[in-house]
Regions:
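Glycine-rich phosphate/adenosyl-contacting loop at the front of the ribokinase-like
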Residues: 2-95
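Short beta-strand/loop segments at the ligand-binding rim of alpha/beta enzyme cores
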Residues: 178-185
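Active-site beta-loop-alpha junctions enriched in small/polar residues
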Residues: 127, 155, 186-190, 217
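Conserved phosphate/ATP/ADP-binding segment of small-molecule kinases
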Residues: 177, 191-239
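Anion (oxyanion) recognition and catalysis
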Residues: 64, 90, 168, 172-176, ...
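Conserved N-terminal subdomain of the carbohydrate kinase-like
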Residues: 69-154
Length: 239
């Protein structure tokens, strides 16, 4: 057990508010999020509220609010969803967005149901999004000077072959620069061709990370054979 040094806590409290605590790089696919305002199947719901979503985007926002500088690599389409994301990025402190605005690609979205018990129903509409076109060329253009950490999830690599290659290149560049790499499996079986490909790919990425972070729901005993197998694989590789 580690004990907290009160002097260190006092020092942290006295740090200037504008001081950057760390620079973290993320890459991902932002989406529009339509949240049901009433119970029932998604096809029966008539009222939704709109928001922005994306696992990596959410992490980037949280980090920026904690005085870390988040460098979020993505690609936004020239459409209402992309424009909404762009405006949200501008509102966040210490949030740096990089990569291109895509005048030809479109941003995708997801629908989230409302429930009184259990997990809500989710429907994805994300094939061929603007962000899925991110390439190794985009990654090679990134200025990683002064960056301390790279955070990767298992979602973006499932979006497209180009996205997977981009993530691999980014992890390779980060390792070469001695950046600390964290990896959140964020299992999304519905995005993969099959279980075998998901297990093989995510396990390969996990082995390149310094820290693997399965979520609480993934770590708990699950009825999903897919999740248990992937988690066992991560545990084995980390041992």
């Amino acid at each position: 057990m580690e004990f907290v040094d009160e002097a260190e806590l006092q020092k942290a409290a006295e740090e200037p508010e504008d001081e950057v605590r760390g620079r973290i790089v993320l890459v991902g696919e932002p989406m529009g999020l339509f949240i049901a305002e009433e119970l029932g199947e998604l096809e029966d719901v008539t009222h939704f509220s709109a928001a922005v979503a994306g696992a990596e985007y959410n992490v980037a926002v949280g980090l920026s609010r904690l005085d870390h500088e988040a460098l979020y690599c993505t690609r936004l389409g020239d459409d209402p969803v992309g424009k909404t994301h762009f405006k949200e990025h501008e509102r966040q402190p210490r949030f740096r967005r990089t990569c291109d605005r895509d005048g030809h690609g479109f941003d995708r979205f997801m629908m989230k149901g409302r429930t009184e018990a259990g997990d809500p129903k989710i429907a994805y509409f994300r094939r061929n999004s603007a962000a899925s076109q991110i390439s190794t060329h985009d990654i090679d253009k990134l200025d990683l000077y002064g960056c301390d950490f790279l955070h990767v999830t298992g979602i973006f690599p499932a979006v497209s072959k180009s996205a997977l290659d981009a993530v691999k290149r980014l992890m390779s560049r980060a390792k070469a620069l001695d950046m600390f790499i964290s990896f959140d499996p964020n299992l999304r079986p519905q995005l993969w061709k099959d279980e075998k490909e998901m297990v093989r790919t995510l396990n390969s990425l996990a082995q390149e990370a310094d820290l693997v972070l399965p979520g609480l729901s993934e770590a708990k005993f699950s009825q999903s054979v897919t999740r248990r197998r992937v988690l066992r694989s991560f545990t084995t590789s980390a041992a």
